[in-house]
Amino acid sequence: MSEQFTRREFLQSACITMGALAVSTSGVDRAFASSSLPINTSGIPSCDVLIIGSGAAGLRAAVAARKKDPSLNVIVVSKVMPTRSATTMAEGGINGVIDFSEGDSFALHAYDTVKGGDFLVDQDTAMKFAEHAGEAIHELDYIGMPFSRDKNGKVDKRYAGGASKIRCNFSADKTGHILTHTCLDDALKNGVKFLMDHQLLDIGVDNGRCEGVVLRDIRTGTIAPVRAKSVVLATGGYTRVFWNRTSTPYIATGDGAASAMRAGVAFKDPEMLQFHPTGVCHGGVLITEAARGEGGILLNNQGERFMKNYAKKMELAPRDIVSRSIETEIREGRAFGKGMEAYVLLDVTHLGKEKIMRNLPQIRHIGLLFENMDLVEKPIAIRPTAHYSMGGIDVMGLESMSTAIPGLFAAGEAACVSIHGANRLGGNSLCDTVVTGKIAGTNAASFASSAGFGSGTHLHDLTLKWMSRFKEVANGKGEVNEMYAIREELGAVNWDNMGVFRTESRLVALEDKHNELQARYDALRIPNTNPVFNTAFTEYVELGNILLASRAARMGAEARKESRGSHYREDYIKRDDANFLKHSMVTMDSNGKLHLGWKDVVVTQFKIEERKY
């Protein structure tokens, strides 16, 4: 493979990162200029701390790294601008105990998190997380996040599903959007540099430690190695395995988890995918849990508030319970419409226009935009949609956020430190991003401060491999729509066989379908040979990643012969703590074969008990 490229060609490719963007003298433009990647003595671009992903986790990691050691060159790499990250789509709020006057506590937040995750949560991690969460809210308030305020001027709170106390701090129903802008402003203020429109291809490992990554400039098509003393993966989740039946952006293709697996890191609990109860019927766009937190109710085609039949907390039961309840209503004929068009109603009309416009303005806009209806006046059609990845890159613990590979860290939804277990509570995801992002960035900076660069040998080989792969795949001979057909089929079969309800027979059949789709993917060729803005190749790489994530999730789902949280097996409807109070751990060998192992859940202070709401 290496004979296909001269050293001159290789270094030209590596150095193109230097001039990919015009350098501007203004602060913001300069921060987003790719010239912030210096060239080291090997002729390969490098930096001290490289962060992949520009959502809240990546931004908080970058700021933490800069604050830990201001002398470090910290670069954030992303496929899109930070304001287009998945974080901006989070609406409801961010959990954190900052008011103890109503009997709330860190221990109660931790218990709610453990119970909400159906006891697949590592309890020591949950306790530390709850303690960090309150601190994170104060820190965000300090750096200027414009939270909604109560009549006393304090940060306002609302209930979220599965919470025993009111601790979900919010900014109307745009909390993620506002959080992103706050974190981006803070990153720019602290001298963080950005490399936009770049795609992660692979992670280099040299003598057992991370030596950097291989990136592709989406605009020019240039494939280049970037050496780094430490790397933080903050690439988000992988719910695009369901393709169009998800509330997450198109970039949520598991790039970090797939790359980490290829580098030798385990994929923990990949089968744990959350289905949010209230996605807009046509398209899956999210209607925030805040709508139910503010008093919204769910109705079937008989006008019945059906959640009273499933849980005492009704609409504020955890998401997995509400999602299964809605799907049961659909299955048993008490929904509106049929098939993929079936739905129930979310009604907030009784809240009144003033309250909706004050606390839920964005969901009103979503209703008008996607359903051409005003939820001030009538209920909106909803059904469950894939929303969040509880599984992810295995990290060693909350206090480090480091992987098994020295110098490689992970944060946010990309990581699985076992905060969320089998079901994430509403409001815990945004908190996860800022808590784990800060910890990962701090430790990545500490590692980089005392580490040197790797040899670059593995990065060199990986870069040549990807350059060859582009030439092989983008050869102009492929069928125009084949890639999109594979992607649509993958999403559909995953939803049908690995969605809200799962069985052995469906999961076994899904393995055969995955093998068929993988074979078609391996033979796939792209009609566009031009490297410049070759979005087909961008999507080709992403499709490979969601195929790998799908295979890992299916393997975990078949092996876990129980029902727990979001993982519901109709052939094993009971939770089985004796055999499955364990994390599934999927690894990949050098031949691309997947292997499944198990790791015990950490149980400390909370008794394992039946989960009731």
Curated annotation (Swiss-Prot):
Active site feature: 319
Per UniProt, which keywords does this protein have?
Answer: Cell membrane, Electron transport, FAD, Flavoprotein, Membrane, Oxidoreductase, Periplasm, Signal, Transport
In the bilayer, the protein is annotated as: Peripheral membrane protein
What positions does the entry give for substrate binding? 276, 288, 387, 424
Gene Ontology CC terms: periplasmic space; plasma membrane
Record's subcellular location = Periplasm; Cell membrane
Q: Catalysed reaction per UniProt?
A: 8-methylmenaquinone-6 + succinate = 8-methylmenaquinol-6 + fumarate
EC number(s) from the headed UniProt entry: 1.3.5.-
What quaternary structure, including any partners, is listed in this protein's UniProt entry? The MFR complex is composed of three subunits: a flavoprotein (SdhA), an iron-sulfur protein (SdhB), and one hydrophobic anchor protein (SdhE).
The name under which this protein is listed is: 8-methylmenaquinol:fumarate reductase flavoprotein subunit
